[in-house]
């Protein structure tokens, strides 16, 4: 068959590859979101990036300020808790000291009734010689308190002192609680004031950022519209030039000379070729007819070869069948000979066994035969 897949021109391949690369670059510029530069305000985008970084830095500084404030408030709260714990510890220690010093069991009102040595502390107030008194003239009786009035005065003074001391401690505790509450209120007020100030600053920063972003978006929109109008105008001009070029090109005018190559007259340009001439078509048909004849002769030769191979295969199969028949006959004859040999051998073995049983193994050993063994210790 006539072959038309001729080697292409290197210059043509280079031009096609250059156009393909330019188209890929153009598509990359238009469709790559990260690296696109046509139709986008790069300066505005960079400004937005810087603005976002500045906003993130402000937020980080605010977070750091909040963290510092929280740390300060936590420290103050820990100090207040520590002071409250110390105050409670001091108060409990004072109460315990008071109980140990002023509220002993021996100083209680009921101690006089339960003290077994209370009577022995008092002596006879008038006379020490018991010889002058009889049994009916006793001066001191069990349970009698001669200094009851002085004891009552002392107890009242002690009670008044304890009450005054408790009142002073309660007043000091109330004043301490009032100071702690005042300090806590001041801290909360300072925290609320600081939070309100930070909220106001944050709102002002947000308003400024919104204003700047709106202005940047307006400028970007205006620049984008201008670039779109310019691009549309350039696209229209390029389309008109392309239409004019196609109308006046050799493709639409069907110029047969453009398909010829000066350096290789036997080769044509595929994209400019308009068809073959009558002589070329006749030559192709003649070549095809010759190829058909050659193919027919080749098929006939292949059929002869296949017939020869078939007859040879048939002969080989018949020879194999004959060999198999001979092998089966030899195997049958061998099995017959082997059977007769086995029968003769069985007869001989049977006769040998009868001879052994009837002649050799007839004399059975007696007990006297076994007594001749193991008669010595060695």
From Swiss-Prot:
Question: Which processes are annotated in GO (biological process)?
Answer: flagellated sperm motility
Q: Which GO terms describe its cellular component?
A: axonemal A tubule inner sheath; sperm flagellum
Please give the start and end residues of each transmembrane region.
none
UniProtKB keywords: Cell projection, Cilium, Coiled coil, Cytoplasm, Cytoskeleton, Flagellum
Q: Which domain of life is it from?
A: Eukaryota
Pfam families listed in its UniProt record: RIB43A
Quaternary structure note: Microtubule inner protein component of sperm flagellar doublet microtubules.
Q: What is this protein called?
A: RIB43A-like with coiled-coils protein 1
User: Which organism does this sequence originate in?
Assistant: Rattus norvegicus
- Organism lineage string: Eukaryota, Metazoa, Chordata, Craniata, Vertebrata
